[in-house]
C-alpha cells in the first residue's frame, strides 16, 4: 500500500465524523444502561405552528479512529453470561492473506489496533441468541433490538426462538450494535464490498464500509477475493458497527491457488474457524448444491451464476460425490454454535437471467436448504435463506411463498431480484423494482445491487448509489406492509413539500446532498430556498402554490362545506358535522323541496 493510502486510513475524511445534513443529530433512545442509536431530524415551524422532529433508524455507529477501531459495546454483556471462555485460537499464517502476501512475506497493511483474544462457548454450552430465546431468556441484544424496532422484547424473543428472525452477533465481534432480520421487522439491506485480484486495497475497503453504513447499510458482506483477505477482514470487523458476512469458500479457494478440485473439508473447516475467531457474524454456505441438481442447469441460458455455487458444482463433478459442505453440515452447525455465527444458506443455483427463473434447479436447491435450516435449528444455530437473482415481476411472489413453506419461515435474504436483463449500468434500478416487490411479500433483507453489477467492481460512489436505492426499496415495502411508524417519514416530507420548506425537504431526503445539488442547478440563490416554487413549473404554474392560494382565497367557502383547512382542527370540524347530522335526525338522505313547484 502506498504512503498516501495508509495516511488516508490514519486520517479519515471530514465526512466520516459529520452528519449527512446539518438538521440531523445523534439522538439515542436511553433505557436503563442501554443507549440505542437513532437520528433526529429537526424541522422548521409551519405557518400554523411547530413541527415535531422526525426520528429515523441509524446504522453508522459512533465516531472512531479507523486505526484503533470501535469500542466493544457488547463485551460486558457477553462476559456476564459466564458461558464463554477465551482461548489461544488457531495460529495465523501468511496463506490466510493469499498468494501475494506469501510472495511478499507480509500483508500490505497489518492491523495495528487491539485484536481481541478469541472466545468460544464453554464445554457443553451453546451461546447463540436462538438458544437463549428458546430458554425464555431475553438478552441485552434482544432488549437493544426491541428498542431499536419500537417492539416488545418478548415479541423479539419469540420470533428468534421460532427461527423467524435472527440477530447475527458473533461473540468475537463485540463492537457490533445488535440488529434483527425478520419479516415482522423493518426490511434490512446489505451492502457488498471487498477487493478482487484486479483492484482495490485495504484502505478503499475500510472507506467503503464506513461509507455504506453512513448511508444506511444494515449489514455488510466482505467478498474479498484478492490480496490480504484476512487482514482486510480484520480492519473491516474492528471498524464495523453492523454485522459482517462472508463467503468462506472464496478464501479457502485462494488457499489452494484457485483450483476448485483441490479444496478439502479440512482446509474449509480451518478457514471457517479462522473467520469465526475474527468475528464474522454470518457466513454464506452453499451446502444445497447437490450432485443430482447440477444436470438441471444444463439447459439454462446462463447456467450457474453464483461464484460459490459454481465452485462447489465444479468440485462435485471433479470428485463425483456430494460436496463436503453438505456431508459435513452437522459439524459446521457445531462450530457455528460455539461462536453464534448465523448461516446464510446460499442459493448456489439461483437464476442468472429471467429466462431461468423459478426452474427445477433453483427450487430443488431451495427445498434442500429448507431441510438444512431445520438441522441447524437442532443445534440452536440461527439461519437465513438466500434467494434470487433474476426473476420476472409476475414470478416474484412465488419465491416468497415457497421459501416460507419449504424453509419454515426462516428469514429470506434476496439479491434483488432483477426483473429484466436489458439494463447494464442501471441494474440498481431493475433490481430495486423486484426488491420492493419481494420485500412487500415477506422478504426480510435485500442485498443491494450497484450500477456496476455485471460490469465491474463497485467504487465508493457506486456503493452509495446502491445503498440509497435499496433503502428506498426497503422503505417502500415497509410502508406497503403498514409497519408501525414507517409512513411518518413520508408524511413529514409531504407536509414540508406542500409548505415549501425546502431545507426540511433536503433534510428528510435519503440523500440530502443530491437533492440540494439538483435544486441548486437552476435556483442556486439562498432566497430560492424559501420560494413557493421550483424550476420545474416556475412561480405561475406551481400546483401546490395554486392549491394553497385556493385555500387562502376561498377559506370561508371551504369552511361552509365542513372541510377542515390544512393546519386547522380537523377533529373539531368532524365533531361539529357529527352534531349537525344527529340534530337533523341521523338520516342519510333528506327530502329536498322544489320551491318553484310549491310557489
UniProtKB/Swiss-Prot annotation:
GO terms for biological process: thiamine biosynthetic process; thiamine diphosphate biosynthetic process. Residues 87-100 have a biased composition (Basic and acidic residues). Binds 1 [4Fe-4S] cluster per subunit. The cluster is coordinated with 3 cysteines and an exchangeable S-adenosyl-L-methionine. It holds the Pfam family ThiC_Rad_SAM. GO terms for cellular component: cytosol. Its EC number is 4.1.99.17. Belongs to the ThiC family. This is Phosphomethylpyrimidine synthase. It comes from Corynebacterium diphtheriae (strain ATCC 700971 / NCTC 13129 / Biotype gravis). The lineage of its organism: Bacteria, Bacillati, Actinomycetota, Actinomycetes, Mycobacteriales.
